[in-house]
Structure formats: structure tokens, C-alpha cells
Amino acid sequence: MDLKKSPLAPKNFPRMPGVTGVSSSTSLSGLKYKGRPDLLLVKLKSNTSVAGVLTKTSVPGCPVTWCKDKLQKGKAQALFVNSGNANVFTGSEGQTAVKEIAKAVSAALKCPTSSVFMASTGVIGEKLNYKKIITKIPKMSENLKEGNWNKAATAITTTDTFPKGASEVALIGNKKIQITGIAKGSGMIAPDMATMLSFIFTDANIPSNILQTLLSRNVQNTFNAITVDSDASTSDTVLLFATGAAKSIAPTSADDPVLKDFELGLQSVMLNLAKQIVCDGEGAQKLIQVNVTGANSKKSARKIGLAIANSPLVKTAIAGGDANWGRVVMAVGKSGEKANPDKISVCFGKTTIAEKGAVVEGYDEAP
């Protein structure tokens, strides 16, 4: 099924250089989509560090369970992704599928099975024909290329209308560091640790425990701060890989000053990808950013912001171009957070509509 490209989509896929120690290839399994790649294989330099954030759902996909276990070792040498089938709610057969695909990747790339990370996205509840996928892996391992980002980003899409990628260059000491990521997401987008699939690669030399801290704290204001339909997916996965190929200075902690520029670059890539996902929300016509100031805490501000963003009445007002500010006040009230009505102000863009608990003098909602 051909999907009409989102009106909020960027004009072109960004030009993104390769990351040393990362190569990839794609293939067509034909399990669901015809004439387009739906398999992605990524080979990573030996001793690559990995960090991840995964869905909090009580019914996670089989690949999510696999990744959760493998993340404990903090090392990766391969990533394999299939689209079209989420491998969720598939019982023991789903777990078998993950194991057999990982074994095939391990054999093709000559790496430990425990260093292979997996992800799936697509229809829930359908058994994954892993035997058909496995036949594609040997050829994929022979066609690995560096900087294959557009094809890689396309292979992991489902109902997306455009592939998503972002890249930044940062400094660690005097070393230039590449940070490049791809993502997919269109439906079931709601902040719950991670939100969709995203894979970020860097050539920085960062231990997995420090990498995990950097990823976890930057998820909060990027992937964890977006919503389209308020539904959290069963397959949400964000993985961050650091090959160490740049031979940069090894940081002593996540707060080491040497990582300041790197963390800014990482956050930029994550925020860019998160916004692209919102722009590709199913049926999306507008991108709205909710800013909350003056709350008792960041946690409180976040809860209020999400109450506004997820409100059906606020969404319909925005969709209809109706500046119904009362619905925003309603959403603040239902958030469950403490709010002083006499101090609430509401602005749409640069226009102040209500201030200190009352509509501003002379405001007219009529067009």
C-alpha cells in the first residue's frame, strides 16, 4: 500500500556520512511488503559499547525481551531488524524466531550470539516466518557498506511515509566525533521510556555504563516527550552504539566535562528524530510544541504538558484552527497537578490569551 507523504515531512533525506566501525545492508523478505526492503543488518566493530531504553509495556515483543537480557553485558557486534511483523504475542515460537535469527547473524558475521541485538516492528499477533528471513542473511553479510543510511532507514519503516535520519558532529577533546541515527514511527507513539524504534551510532570511545546514563537522561526531553495518539507500543526500542573507532579520550563519568559537546550533539540527533516521528504521525497535519513554565517541578511540568498534548478536545481545537484556550485550562486542571488558577497564563505562539487567571482585555476568539 502506497502511503501519501506527510505534509510535515522534510524535503529530502539528510546527507549523512558514515560512522567508522558501522556497516549495513538491506534485503527484501517479502513477508508483508512487496518491492521494498524490510530487513536491516548492521555490523559493528568488535568491542562496540551499547546502551538502550526499552518499552515499559507488560506485553513486550520477543526482540525487546532479547535486547533487555543482552544489554546487561554492554557489548554489541550486530543489529538485525525486520519490519512488517512485530513478533509480539507469539509465544514460544516468537522466542524461537529471535534465537534462530540471532544464530544466523552470528554465523554470517562470525560473532557471539550474545552480541547480536534484535528489533521487530509491524503487525502484532502474527507468527514470524523466521526461516524465510534466515535465507537472506548470508547474502546481506556479503553486501555490507558504510554510510548506507537512507536504505537502512527505509528498511525499518512500516506505516511511515518517509525515512527518518539525523546526524551531528561533536568534539571529545580534539577529536571530531560522528553521531548518526535513524528512526521509524508513525502510530502508537506515546512517551513510555522510548517511543518507536531508533538506532544511533557514534565512533566515540565511551564505556557502556556511561553511554547508558547519557542515553537515559536525554531520552526524557526527546523521545520521551512526544505523543501522537497516546498509545505506547509493544516494541519501543532505542539503542545507542559507540564503536570507539575515533580513539577519543575515554571519559571517567557521564558528567565528565570532556563529554559536554558530545552530549549536546547526541541530544540534537535524538530531538531531531523525535520531531520527525511526530511529523509522520498517522494523519498528522500540524506539529505543536507545548511549553510549561512555573510548575513545581520538571515532573509536574511534564505531566501538565502531556495532559494538554493528549487532550482530544485540545487536539480537535488545533486541527480546526480554533483558539479555544479554555480547553487548555481544562487540560491543566485534569492533569492532577497542583495549579493556582490566579497565576495561570495561556499563550498561543507569541499571542497572550489569558494572563494571571483571566482572559486578557480586548481578546476576541472570533475570527
Question: Predicted regions: what is each one?
Answer:
Residues 2-82, 86-99, 106-367:
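A structural signal for small-residue-enriched, beta-sheet-centric alpha/beta enzyme cores
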